[in-house]
Amino acid sequence: RLKLTGRNLFFNLRLIRQYGLVPFDSYEGTQPRNVNAINRKAMIVAQQKAGEKATMASFKNALNSYLDDALGALPLNVYLFGVEYTPLQFAQSIVPADSYKAYCSVTHHPFYREVLQESPDNNSYELFNNVPIDSLMHIIDSQLSAHKAVCWEGSLPQDEYIMEQGVAQLDSKISRVDQNMRQHAIESYTTYDQHAMSIVGKAHDKHGNIYYIAKNSWGKNIPFGG
């Protein structure tokens, strides 16, 4: 199981390509670790070093020393199924380079080009392929038809997402979102990259209305087991 949090998906993928991956079981010791507590302590280390006006090298040394104590020393190699990998080789075997593509649909940039997506979580300036909204929906549907998941980043307004039912719906008066409606929502900040989920399939109700099935990260104690 792989879990990445923070910023957007492509920022995390770039970190994987740059630094590699190490399975949790590759670390020495079998005692469970409280990841939340480790994160809080790491933040305290950073704040202390900032207060000391320490150099980046001093901060990295202090943080690495703490992480070695909390997690164990960083493994230089990964051993899995009788094969030895470096962290970068292991990452490439799990997430091959260019195995994901990012798409957006905005009219203030030209279509069919890589553009900078101006969204709060894209502070690493990742580029997205800008396509018309109909093309974007076709890409999503074609990937699902090929049994591939799609990472969705967007917002879940309280008046559109009913947690008790596990369903998100637009106003019933809106039969179809067109390019102009989407652009207005983006420019008015009524939609933005507040949350991310994996779209894994499609479904329909007895009236023929189409729904996209998305896996959430809020646990299994919600409708449809998450």
Residue ranges of predicted features:
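Papain-like cysteine protease catalytic cores
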Residues: 1-84
